[in-house]
């Protein structure tokens, strides 16, 4: 196979998929704060995941590792409860709703629905 053909194939693959999918945690961080570890939300939310102060379990909210650990500590029980009550894992859309409005997971508001769709687009790219 010639170098030119290999280059053409690789270029085609790259152009056909210019963006790569993010995992859920990366997409959540991107949607919530643009990956800004120093972000503070209008309600005092902290970290790249915009966690409410009363839910923050400890650690440095400006440290990406601590923030991810805190987000997982908050979210994993929500995911477990969803799976128990719905008899299936949460979809990407439901994951985002569980993060922002767990009490409305079956009927999210229009604003949360719009953000959940953007979240899904980041995960599925």
What are the functions of these language-model segments?
Residues 36-39, 82:
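A short, acidic/glycine-rich surface segment
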Residues 6-14:
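Bacterial N-terminal signal peptides
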Residues 22-36, 51, 71-72, 95-103:
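Short, functionally critical alpha-helical segments immediately adjacent to catalytic or ligand/cofactor-binding
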